[in-house]
């Protein structure tokens, strides 16, 4: 009976170690996924910011052209 317990105990211990390693790997993958999501958010916000800055610049240029036209009365 004692000779059967040793292999069974070994199998249980190896299973626990394997499960622990899988959980650690899964946690690492989840952290990596969160980092990727943050990078996507940053790139998306950067793109939106660049678009808004470009739109603001073009709007300011058109307003300045209109004002200079009215001030110089060249319209």
From Swiss-Prot:
Query: Mind listing the UniProt keywords for this protein, alphabetically?
Result: Amphibian defense peptide, Antibiotic, Antimicrobial, Cleavage on pair of basic residues, Cytolysis, Disulfide bond, Fungicide, Hemolysis, Secreted, Signal
The Gene Ontology biological process annotation of the record reads: defense response to fungus; defense response to Gram-negative bacterium; defense response to Gram-positive bacterium; killing of cells of another organism
Q: Where is it made, tissue-wise?
A: Expressed by the skin glands.
Checking Pfam families in the record gives: Antimicrobial_2 (PF08023), FSAP_sig_propep (PF03032)
Q: Does the keyword Iron-sulfur apply?
A: no
Q: Which InterPro entries match?
A: Antimicrobial_frog_2 (IPR012521), Frog_antimicrobial_propeptide (IPR004275)
Q: Where in the cell is it found?
A: Secreted
Where does the record locate the signal sequence feature? 1-22
A single GO cellular-component term on record: extracellular region
Prosequence residues removed at maturation: 23-40
- Answer whether the UniProt record assigns the keyword Ubl conjugation to this protein: no
Q: List the disulfide bonds.
A: 69-75
Family, according to the entry, reads as follows: Belongs to the frog skin active peptide (FSAP) family. Brevinin subfamily.
The record's function comment reads: Has antimicrobial activity against some Gram-positive bacteria and fungi but has no activity against a range of Gram-negative bacteria except P.faecalis. Has antimicrobial activity against the Gram-positive bacteria S.aureus ATCC 25923 (MIC=19 uM), B.licheniformis X39 (MIC=37.5 uM) and R.rhodochrous X15 (MIC=9.5 uM), is virtually inactive against E.faecium 091299 (MIC=150 uM) and S.carnosus KHS (MIC=150 uM) and inactive against E.faecalis 981. Active against the Gram-negative bacterium P.faecalis X29 (MIC=9.5 uM) and is inactive against E.coli, P.aeruginosa and S.typhi.
Q: What is this protein called?
A: Brevinin-2HS2B
Look up and give the organism this protein is from: Odorrana hainanensis
């Amino acid at each position: 009976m004692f000779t059967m317990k040793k292999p069974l105990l070994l199998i249980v211990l190896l299973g626990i170690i394997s499960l622990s390693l899988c959980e650690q790997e899964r946690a690492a993958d989840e952290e990596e996924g969160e980092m990727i999501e943050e990078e996507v958010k940053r790139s998306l916000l950067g793109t939106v910011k660049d678009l808004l800055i470009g739109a603001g610049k073009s709007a300011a240029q058109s307003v300045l052209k209109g004002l200079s036209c009215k001030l110089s009365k060249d319209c």
